[in-house]
Amino acid sequence: MASVAESSGVVEVIELISDGGNDLPRKIMSGRHGGICPRILMPCKTDDDCMLDCRCLSNGYCG
């Protein structure tokens, strides 16, 4: 199940993921480049510290 909202070139998708017993909502941000990056506040120093198609932003967090 997914819900989609679009504003200013960014598409947000809220999916239900399962951890084995509970379904948990997960927000993913899909930008203009087509990549998918979970919207989780995650500190980083390099792009390698980030998940999936995220990159390390100048504020020190993945996005």
Curated annotation (Swiss-Prot):
Domain of life of the native organism: Eukaryota
Name recorded for this polypeptide: Trypsin inhibitor 5
Site positions per UniProt: Reactive bond: R39, I40
SMART domains assigned: PTI (SM00286)
Keyword terms: Disulfide bond, Knottin, Protease inhibitor, Secreted, Serine protease inhibitor, Signal
Major localisation: secreted
Function: Inhibits trypsin.
Disulfide bond entries: C37-C54, C44-C56, C50-C62
GO MF terms held by the record: serine-type endopeptidase inhibitor activity
Pro-peptide region(s): 22-34
Signal peptide limits: 1-21
InterPro entries: Prot_inh_squash, Proteinase_amylase_inhib_sf
